[in-house]
Each structure stands twice: as C-alpha cells, then as structure tokens.
Regions:
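Beta-rich, blade/repeat-based domains predominating
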Residues: 1-2, 7, 32-33, 40-45, ...
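Blade-level signature of beta-propeller repeat domains, shared across WD40, Kelch, NHL, RCC1
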Residues: 174-207
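Short leucine-rich amphipathic alpha-helical surface patches
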Residues: 135-137, 143, 154-161, 165-171, ...
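Loop/turn-rich, solvent-exposed surfaces of beta-rich toroidal or solenoidal domains
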Residues: 86, 93-104, 109-159
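Noncatalytic, solvent-exposed loop/strand surfaces
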Residues: 27, 31, 100-102, 162
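Blade-edge beta-strand/turn elements of extracellular beta-propeller
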Residues: 43-66, 103-123, 153-169
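Surface-exposed, flexible loop/turn segments at secondary-structure boundaries
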Residues: 9, 15, 54, 87, ...
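Short, conserved, GDST-rich strand-edge loop motifs in beta-rich repeat architectures
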Residues: 2-41, 82-94, 144-148, 197-200
Length: 207
C-alpha cells in the first residue's frame, strides 16, 4: 500500500474504475466534533488522482456545493456527485442536498452536468449522504429526512432519475453498501444501528 496523494487529515469518499483512477474529495471532515477545524489543505472540490500523484480538479465547489458522496455508473460512463445539505453547526453556505450527474469521456474529462434529483418526496427533503449502484444502474441512496416520520432510510432511483423504490427505517441513514457472496445484501449504516436486507438485485461490481 502506498499514498497516491495526501489531501487532508481524514478519509475522503472515493470512487474508482478500471479506466478512471480514484475520484477524491476534500470535504470538511477529519476532526472530532466540537473542536476547531484544521486548516483546509485544498478547496472543497472533487479531485482526480492518478497513480503518479497528480491531482486534477474535475468538479468545483461552484458546480456542486459541498460535494460528498460520489459513484460511477456500472459502465463508468456517468459520474454521480452528491451535494451535501447544510447540517447543524455548519458555518458555510452548504449544499442543497441533491445529486448531479456528469458524462465521463474517454479522456476521463467530465461534461454535460445535469441535476439528477433533488430528493424531494411528497414535499419532504430526503437528503442523501452515500449511494451505490446496482448492476442495472439504479442508484440506492441513503435518506436523511430529519424528524419526518417514514422518510428516513433508503431511496432508489432509476438511471433516468425516477424514484422506483424506498426502504423506510426508524433512523437517519448515512451510507449504504452491497455485500455478501452474491452482492445481493444491502447494508445500511444508520445513526445508531446497522441494518441489512436481501434485495432482488446485485451491487455493481467494483472496478
């Protein structure tokens, strides 16, 4: 194991693919709550790190405010980036709690940015944090709806941005991951619990 690029004190979200070296973030993480934040080493953007250690900005804060979770489509032709909503105690402007999608070109350049979804369901904001793709390109996204009963858990969206399913949980969910020998068990990391359920699909294979 070796360091590709030193970004900051903490572990950023990352997404990798066979022809797309890891996408890296530099969010305001890595410090215990209640303590003064450390000096940010790089602006809050999405960076592409290649094996040589070179960093290229691929998505700016202006394009996606407070970028957080990111993932590729199964064919690595789309990159999805979550804009984290402003949380308690945040002093910055914060994002809108939505998701944007970009086309990934053969040269690894991003283009054609579009709003994928604003995560509004029945007038309730089901803000995301982490997300994963299944083999059909559907996106399984964590849902943080605060105290709105029945809206925390997981939302599922098809590649066109249409809501096609929900998993309701009694807690806010921060992240999700497919696991098990067949990648057909969805693990959901909630505020105080870890939930798991078998689903009728499989998680997309890693790069």
């Amino acid at each position: 194991m070796w360091t590709v690029a030193q970004l900051y004190e903490g572990e950023p979200d990352a997404a990798g693919g066979p022809s797309n070296p890891a996408g890296k973030l530099n969010p305001r993480l890595g410090r215990p709550a209640g303590f003064t934040a450390g000096k940010r080493e790089l602006p809050t953007n999405v960076y592409r790190a290649d094996p040589s250690g070179r960093l290229d900005v691929v998505v700016t804060e202006d394009q996606v405010p407070d970028p957080n979770g990111l993932l590729f489509s199964p064919d690595y032709k789309k990159l999805y980036v979550i804009s984290t909503g402003k949380g308690p105690g945040d002093t910055g402007p914060g994002g809108k709690g939505d998701m944007h999608v970009f086309d990934v070109g053969p040269d690894n350049k991003l283009s054609n940015q579009k709003l994928f979804t604003d995560f509004m369901i029945d007038g309730v904001k089901c803000g995301p944090d982490g997300a994963r793709c299944d083999v059909d390109g559907n996106l399984w996204c964590s849902s943080n709806a605060g105290r709105a009963v029945g809206y925390n858990g997981v939302t599922v969206w098809n590649p066109q941005g249409k809501l096609i399913g929900r998993i309701r949980l009694p807690e806010v969910v921060a992240n999700v991951c497919f696991g098990g020998p067949k990648r057909n068990r969805l693990f959901m990391a909630a505020s105080q619990s870890l939930y798991a359920v078998y689903v009728a699909t499989q998680g997309a294979t890693p790069g």
